[in-house]
Structures are given as C-alpha cells and as structure tokens.
Amino acid sequence: MRNGKLVVAQIGCGKFAEYQDLPNITSLEKLTLKWICDLDLERAGAMQKKFGAEKITADFKEICADPEVDLIKIATSHEIHLPIVECAAAAGKHIFCEKPMAMRDEEAWRIMKAVRKHGVKLCVDLNRRMSPALQALKKSVYDHLANPKHSPWRYIETLREPLPEEEYKHMIIRIQDESSSYGLQHVDPLIGGGEIIGESVHWLDVACWFFAPAVPVEITAWGSSRLSHGINLKFSNGDDMTLTFSCSGTFDYPKELFEVTAGNAFFRSEFFVENNAYGIPGAKSEYFPMKHYDGDIREEGFNAYIAKYHERFSNFTGNSKDLETAKPFEVDKGHLNMWKAFVEAILNDKPSPCDELAGFQSTYLAQLAIRSIESRQTLPVPVERYIPAIFIR
C-alpha cells in the first residue's frame, strides 16, 4: 500500500491491456500503477509513457520480488498464467488473471492450491457476470419468479397444477463473430487453445453464475473445438443453457444475445445495451449506456447502438482495425465493474467477485465440451470434479 492505495503491476501489455486493463487501472483512485512488464521492452516503454507507470521490466519475477506491489494483473497468453500465478502467490500478491484461468485441469488445480496456500485473493476476468445488462437480466428473472404477474390475456387451456418441467428455466446464448479478426495464436493448441477455451469460458461462466446454486450435471457439445460450436449445459434443478457460437458472422451486427424463458415469461438482453421482458404487465425496456462513444447520437438502446455503429463507419474506408485504435467504441461488458469489485474485496477482505473455483469450473466445462465434440457423446459433470478437494500442506 502507498498512501492508502493498492500498488499494481501489469504483466502483459498487448491490445487488451492497452484498451482495457491500463485505462481501468489508471481510472480508479484506489490504485497506483507502478510496473508494466512485457517481453517486448519497447512496447512496455510505450505503455509506460502512455499510462504513467513508474517502472518497466521484461521479467515478471522482478515484480514479484518488489515488496511494495499488492496486486498483479496478468494479461499474457494463456499458457503462461500458471508460473506467474505461482510466483505472485508465493510472494503474497493478490492476482487478477485474464480468462481462461488455465488451459488444462492440472494447471487450474495448481493455481487453486497456490492462492489458497499463500492466502491471497484471485479474480478471473470472466467479466460478463459483472456487466450492468446481465446483472439486471438476472434480477428481472428472479424478481418475476418470486412475484409472478401475467398479462390478463394469457392463453390458458385448463387450470391445473404445473408439471415439473414447466418450472425449469432455459437460457439461449447466441454468439456471432467474425473469424477474420482472429490471429493464429487464438487457435494454436499450445497458446490459445481455440474458441471454446479462449472465449466460451465466458458464457459457460454466465450460465453457472445465473443458475447458481444449481450445478451442472451434463454437457453436450458439437461442431469445432477451435472455431464454430454449440454447447448444451444441463443443471441439477432441470435448468439448461444452450450456446451457439458462429465464427462466420460479421462485426456489422452485434456479437452477443442472451435470452431466458422462465415463469411463463420471456427475457432478452441485446448486446449489453437493452433488456426487455415479455409476458409481464407493465414491463419496460431497460437501457444501458455504452462505455465508450463520442458521436452525436444521444439515444440509448439496441436500435440506437446500430445507428451509432453505422455513424462510426459512415466516412471511413480501410481496415476497421485501424479505427479501433484511433476511436474507442465499446459497450459495457463489465470489465471496470470487475476491477472495482476486486479492489473492494482486497481492501475490505471480502470474497473475490470471480474466484479461483469459478475460474477452474469454466475451464473444466470447456475441456468437457471439447471431449464431447471429439467423442460425439453427452458427458456427465461429476460433482467431485466440478468442486475438487484441494489439500494444502
């Protein structure tokens, strides 16, 4: 701590660090950015100049050896999370790790053991659970189930007691992405692991967070483990989530859609900017402002987002990658909220908003999904694997 602030080090300073981590760190008054670490010292120096870090290094062990550092953010490629976590935990540093926490079960178990042995907090950046839109979606669903109301024109054939299956909640997550934006590192089996490990851990985590305390009991997956795929995840109380991930879509339309049916009502969250509920009298649309937008359209919501997107490209030609770095344009997926919650957890000794168990569970389910694709079989989710017993010497 320095002057009542947590001293932070950033390890890995690629595009995500430049446009998410470092702006978030420097925006929070309870944090002080001391170190930036990257194998490319020229890149680290550029980020130091842009964000005002005090020191740079190419060796993460130098950061772990600094007694002033309280918190380390890891934004490296997936395969080197484990050695950094083990070093940081042994040095008593709290750790904010980019998703996936690990690529394989043994790596995840070792991470769990390290942070628990040394008594440090770990947060995994499975940020969708912290987005304002999905927080509101979950609240709307469970508020309705606690006090259901229905339109007077609801179709009822015969009054009767509901059948057990009619009590189940069902979630559909639709992801349409554009694979021309992927580098080969994303699908390299040693570095990125493919889109189930690299991306779909987000939506597996959303389902587990949304339906808790129910736990997954069965998983079925199909397609390609490295690109387009589908996953169905069934829970102990009968609820289920079905994910469809297509990499043959376009950035010209929003990437993520979440839908839930529950209690004879339908709930939809459209790309973190608008939520709607149907079958509930008086239900109103909820709008969520974008995190970054500097155009002229003042309205909020899904249609306004589409208009803002087209406004952004109205006078632009060339590779949109160039515009991304020059003119930020971003919905609120929960990144900053996750930072705020984790800082609060450290300062006030509260539970992490997405701890090492949640990080492991998303990785474990992703590995099961890959095995389901390879075997073309539905697989069980044994509770002894989903909630492992980690012995600390």
Task: List PLM regions with ranges.
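N-terminal Rossmann-like dinucleotide-binding module
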Residues: 1-51
